[in-house]
């Protein structure tokens, strides 16, 4: 296994390493770079995102490209829900707007399963979109990584 194929922290997870893994995933997705994000997944990764399926890394990259072309000014917060050995469950919320300026807060849960090298092999996501007014937004940091001092989901009452 080369370093390029390793994505620490590696399973089996502790509470601390699972929290780090979740934050790294959040940071990656907030970067909105499909090529870079896709490298966190195995070549044969399996995804279900809402009703869309991806059966490998290339399909996942295509999904991410379409997603971030539609979901503009995307800002995401993830929170650890549960973990064991090579699996992590998260809950999350993200805010975005469409090309007509309509704002949404999307709430979701994901189940992740990791290969021994720390790459994600399976990702199963359930997500609901809630229309919000721009004045109801809670995520206002500059695009990119959420600042360390920004409240998390529980702190925001979400």
Predicted ranges, named:
Residues 1-43, 153-158:
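Short, low-complexity N-terminal intrinsically disordered segments enriched in polar/charged residues
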Residues 2-13, 68-158:
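A beta-strand edge to alpha-helix "cap/lid" segment located at domain peripheries
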Residues 17, 34-88:
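A solvent-exposed, acidic/Ser-Thr-rich amphipathic alpha-helical stretch
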Residues 20, 24-27, 39, 62, ...:
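Charged/polar, solvent-exposed surface patches and flexible loops
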Residues 22, 41, 64, 92-94, ...:
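Hydrophobic alpha-helical core bundles mediating ligand binding, dimerization, or RNAP-core interactions
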């Amino acid at each position: 296994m080369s370093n390029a194929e390793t994505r620490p922290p590696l399973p089996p997870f502790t509470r601390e390493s699972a929290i780090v893994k979740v934050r790294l995933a959040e940071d990656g997705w907030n970067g909105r770079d499909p090529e870079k994000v896709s490298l966190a997944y195995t070549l044969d990764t399996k995804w279900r995102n809402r009703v869309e399926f991806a059966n490998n890394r290339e399909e996942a990259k295509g999904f991410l490209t379409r997603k971030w072309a539609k979901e503009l000014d995307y800002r995401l917060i993830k929170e650890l829900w549960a973990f064991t050995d090579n699996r992590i469950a998260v809950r999350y919320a993200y805010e975005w707007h469409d090309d007509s300026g309509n704002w949404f807060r999307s709430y979701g849960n994901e189940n992740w399963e990791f290969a021994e090298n720390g790459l994600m092999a399976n990702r199963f996501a359930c997500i609901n979109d809630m229309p919000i007014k721009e004045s109801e937004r809670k995520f206002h940091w500059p695009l990119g990584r959420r600042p360390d001092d920004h409240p998390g989901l529980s702190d925001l009452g979400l």
